[in-house]
Structure formats: C-alpha cells, structure tokens
Design a protein with these regions (language model features):
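Residue-level signal for well-ordered alpha-helical segments
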Residues: 45, 95, 99, 143, ...
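Short linear motifs at secondary-structure transitions and domain/linker junctions
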Residues: 11-18, 42, 57-64, 92, ...
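Detector for outer-membrane/organellar transmembrane beta-barrel domains
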Residues: 152-252
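Outer membrane beta-barrel transmembrane domains
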Residues: 112-115, 205-309
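Outer membrane beta-barrel translocator domains of Type V secretion systems
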Residues: 1-174, 286-300
C-alpha cells in the first residue's frame, strides 16, 4: 500500500490554481509593475482507503512553492498578460495498514519541481471579466518504503503536469466600502508519473499502473473585496468545487493489484482571507476540505505571501 500512497503524494505535489499565487488585491498596485516574488506554504492531511477498503492509509504533505513574474504588461485596451517561472519542494509521509492482517508499512516522498506559468486578464484594473491561466511543471521524486520486518526500499521517479484554467469574475453589488462578486471557473490538469517497474530487495517486483490522470475542477467562488482608498485593503472568499479524476493509481505485485478508493469524484469547500499590509506586501490564508466516497477526506491549510519590488 505504501507504494500506492507514494504515487498519490507525488501526484498531489503538482496541484496549483491561479488564485493560489495571485491575490485579488495585489493587481491594484501592480498592474504593470515588476518584479515580484510570491511564496506559498501548504500542509495537507489525507485519509484514504485502498483496494475496496482492505487497506487504510493516512498521509501528510508539506509543500513550499515560490515564483516570480518575468513579464507583466497591460495593453491599451486594459487587458493584462503575465508570464513567470516557479519552483517547488514537497515532503510527504504516509502509513498504510491492512484491515485483516497485522501488517503496517510507511512511505515517504521528497519532490522538487520546476515550472512556468502564464495568465491573461480581460480587465487589469479590477480583474472583472474573463481570465485564463496555464502552467507546466516537471518534477523529480525520491521515494522510500519501509515494511514491517523488511529492509528499506528506495527508488526514484519523475513526472510532469500541464494545466489550463478559465473563469469569469462577475461583480453583482458595490457599496461605498466593498465590492461583491461571483467567479465561476473550470480547470483541467493533466499529470503523468513515470515509475519504472521496481524490484525489491527480496526479488518481488512492483508494477505501477494508471500513471496518467486528467483532473477536472468545476467551481464557484464568492468574493467580498474592500474598495476604499485605504492601502490596507482586505478580502474574504468562499469557494465550492467538484473534482473528477479520470484514473485511480494502481500497483501490481505477485499477481495481486490494488488501487485508490474514494477519490474519483470529490466535493471541496474553501474559505479564505487576503490582506494588504502596505503597497508592497500581501498575505492570504485559506482552509479547505475535500470529501469523497469510501471515507475519503483531505484537509489543507495554505499561507501565501507576495512582495512587490
């Protein structure tokens, strides 16, 4: 089960959305300024079963991601285009236990990713209207598995991911102090892990399957943003999403095959807050939870910082 858990941890390291790295507030000071640096810290705790509830798993994942815009320009029509580079480090650990046998195992993954991203906004001034975002990432992963009473197994893997996201911000109410908006959005993320068949120290072989996955995310975000002349604005948001994964990771060994359970279709709720400390510093924080079938659950806390030079 730990080999399968390591696949899930590696695949999760690619997760990234536009508004993970772009705050709603910073555009008011940085429509075409630069450069900037953004940093994202996140911690995720996941509970998941494998092979029709025969194996129980718990996983923890820490990710540190940072990047900078290399190009940021606003056209005469008020449209904004930006392009940047990013890097990420992830450290994950997980434990699995067999339901009807006294067998536990542990796994861990260290990952390093490099990537590029690009975004387009219809209205640079307040980010109303349409937007589009895309990114590409490539990652390298060091994996370990420790079975009870067995020697440690170590192996290397790699993978890549490609994403396209589109959405529209619709302002529906404006007061003297705040602007309220809805933002429907759609994101497609394709990831491909490359795991060679691995031979354990005892001679058993581990074959990895369903390494490619297309995740569809359809969601709606509600936003309340301060619109006064203050240089210390803030915003609140709530977001609901439906996520669909085309494949569940699988592994095969000694004629037996096991796969992920419960994450084919997921519901997600996110709540967040963004704050402008001054014209250069911005911070955002959010909490989210995902829920699926077969007792699948995942909870994440995220903290993002952005500095404008």
């Amino acid at each position: 089960g730990s080999y399968l858990g390591n696949m899930a941890l590696a695949g999760s390291m690619f997760d990234l959305r536009l508004y993970d790295r772009e705050t709603h507030l910073q555009h008011q000071n940085n429509q075409e300024d630069g450069p900037n640096i953004w940093i994202i810290n996140s911690y995720t705790r996941t509970k998941q079963d494998f092979s029709n509830d025969q194996i129980h798993g718990n996983a923890n994942l820490y990710k540190l991601r940072m990047g900078t815009d290399l190009y940021n320009e606003v056209s005469n029509k008020g449209e904004q285009q930006l392009f940047g580079i990013m890097a990420a480090y992830g450290n994950g650990s997980q434990t699995t236990s067999a339901r009807f046998a006294n067998r536990d195992s542990k796994g861990s993954v260290d990952g390093f990713l490099l990537g590029v991203y690009g975004s387009w906004f219809e209205n640079a001034h307040d980010r109303s209207g349409w937007y589009a975002d895309t990114w590409f990432q490539y990652g390298w992963f060091d994996n370990e598995v420790n079975g009870a009473g067995l020697s440690k197994e170590s192996y290397d893997t790699n993978g890549w991911g490609l994403s396209a996201e589109i959405g529209k911000s619709i302002n529906y109410k404006e007061t003297d102090r705040r602007t309220y908006s809805w933002q429907p959005k759609l994101q497609l993320t394709y990831t491909k892990l490359n795991n060679d068949t691995y031979t354990e120290n005892n001679g058993s072989t581990i074959a990895f399957g369903n390494e490619a996955n297309l995740q569809t995310r359809l969601g709606l975000r509600w936003l309340s943003e301060q619109n006064t002349a203050s240089t210390k604005k803030d915003s609140f948001f709530a977001e609901v999403n439906w996520l669909h994964n085309s494949n569940n990771y699988t592994i095969s060994s000694l004629g037996d095959s096991i796969s992920q359970d419960g994450n084919k279709n997921l519901g997600e709720l996110r709540l967040g807050y963004e704050k402008e400390f001054n014209k250069d510093w911005f911070i955002s924080a959010d909490l989210s939870g995902r829920f699926g079938s077969n007792s699948y659950s995942s909870f994440q806390g995220m903290l993002s910082l952005e500095y404008l030079f």
